[in-house]
Amino acid sequence: MNKGIAEILAEASKMETVEERVEHLKKNDHPSLQTVLYYCYHPSITWLLPDTNPPYKPRLKEEDIQNVLKSDFRKVRMFVEGKDYDNVKPIKREMLFIEFIESLDPDDAKLILSIKNKKMPWKNISRHVAKKAFPGLGL
């Protein structure tokens, strides 16, 4: 079964120990998973979006679209400072962001909405856990 990024993080958050959570993240490693953790926890990342969540229409949970975030995560660069998209007008950026989150699995969309405000929806997936799982991220 193809797991979405939010699903992997939710599963890890339910595990009892830090070591189990770290191992689960390593076992389900994917560039998009690492990038989610990096964009959430790295102090140099600044999102170029308002703090409030935009109005959007979430997809149906029944749709099998957990892979969309994994395959389209490169689009997130458009919403972060210093990633070659700083000159995009704010209104255009916000419109592109709405289109992006509307294309995602509803759980992955909620995850992106949280990390843009530097918050992880699962308290057990801390910066410490991310750092132990993926020390190369420089967290």
Model-predicted regions and their roles:
Residues 1-139:
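N-terminal nucleic-acid-engaging modules of covalent nucleotidyltransferase systems
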